[in-house]
Amino acid sequence: MIALLAAATAIPAGAAPAPFSLEISQLTSGEKHHFFGYIGQCRTIPWNESGRYVLGLEIDAIDRMPKPGEAALIVLIDTRQNNQIIPIEKTRAWNPQQGTMFYWNPLAAGTQFFFNDRDEETGKIFTVLYDIGKRERIREYRFDDTPVANGGVAQKGGAFLALNYGRMARLRPVTGYPGVADWSQAGDPAPANDGIFVVDTRTGARRLLVSFRQLADKLKEADFRTPDLPLFINHSLWNRDGNRVYFFARGGWNRRGSRINVPFSIHSDGTNLTCHSQHIGGHPEWAEGSLVIGRSGPDQILYDIDTRKVAGKLGTPKIFPNPEGDVSLSSDGKWFVNGYKTGTSNHYVVYRRSDGASVRSEGFDKGRYSGDIRIDPAPRWNRTNDAILVPGLADNGTRQMFVIRIRSNE
């Protein structure tokens, strides 16, 4: 463990002290690498309901993408037992940026969580529901003809958005799993039988929410002059109410030349598919109702997907020097964190929405890892809205998990 460190920016002489400060502690340690994953699902909370256990992966190497079928160890960090690392399972569907799409089941967040896995023999992807009390997989969501896996759990539970990770591994490796079976038609840039699916976690039933063919048609209607590039999905995000989904339709990431990078929204019943001309940069995050947090120009903005207008701003460009960073809103909606890179470090700005007070953290070493093996800032809140899990390199050069804790000075 490292010592606790104050992490506030300097306060000018004569100025009032910040109403809160930040403390940093190292959660995991050792010769192995430990990490959680990224913020590709909204309200992604690494802690279970009681706050005792934190989910993580343990791996041997961080300087390369995993080999096809290479396993990562799934671990629990017991915060009541000196952060003991407890191995419980393995997954063969993971990568260094996103992990394995961990998400505690909102309907049983004390003991159950989702993760992605692949069949060792067939390479087909699927999602697992695991119970830490029973120490067993209590359900696997398999679709053998057209395998897909979790790409975003509904924040209130009951469903997850499912994606074809084989297609993503082909079209943008950093978001896929190497060697996963790809069932989509390589010669069809926008197949009608692939896209975003919704899986009912209770029944296991699956339906196609929106197809790539529908997205391609919408792009043409909106007069996006792009070549017929194969489309894929990134950042499939349920809103807090569970009635809207925001996502990016993309293409051309594995080649030189023009790209497609267009935001869409759709109601969770499959209606109101909307192609947005206002691009929200970075990793978007849902605020209240129909509001999405992202970047427009130098500003951290609130964009209303229903009115298709910018509805407000958070802070200023001085507070958020890179509004296109990784962003996350606390579970109660009162706190916001923006993680951004400078050189070989990740920094975090913690912002209180009620009064605009903010504090910037010290830098977390991310090394020179880049591209598919980069260490993104990826901040993730706890359930009590006073701590954030972040990645970084420890003194021995291993990738570890750190906690930024908010301390009141009032």
How would you name each of these model-derived features?
Residues S25-G37, P87-P96, D144-D145, R206-D228, ...:
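Surface-exposed loop and turn segments in beta-propeller and other repeat-based domains
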Residues Q26-A72, S236:
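Beta-strand-rich domains and repeat architectures in extracellular enzymes and scaffolds
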Residues I39-R43, A61, K67-D119, I125, ...:
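Blade-loop segments of beta-propeller domains
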Residues T44-V54, W94-E120, A149-A159, L163-N164, ...:
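Blade-terminus and WD-like Trp-Asp/Gly-His loop motifs, strongest in beta-propeller folds
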Residues L57-A71, F115-D119, A162-N193, F248-I260, ...:
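Short, conserved, GDST-rich strand-edge loop motifs in beta-rich repeat architectures
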Residues T91-P106, F115-G195, L209-R225:
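Asp-box/WD-like beta-propeller blade repeats and closely related beta-sheet repeat scaffolds
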Residues S277-G282, G315-V327, A357-R380:
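Conserved blade-ending motifs and adjacent loop-strand segments that build the rim/top face
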Residues D299, P317-A357:
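Loop/turn-rich, solvent-exposed surfaces of beta-rich toroidal or solenoidal domains
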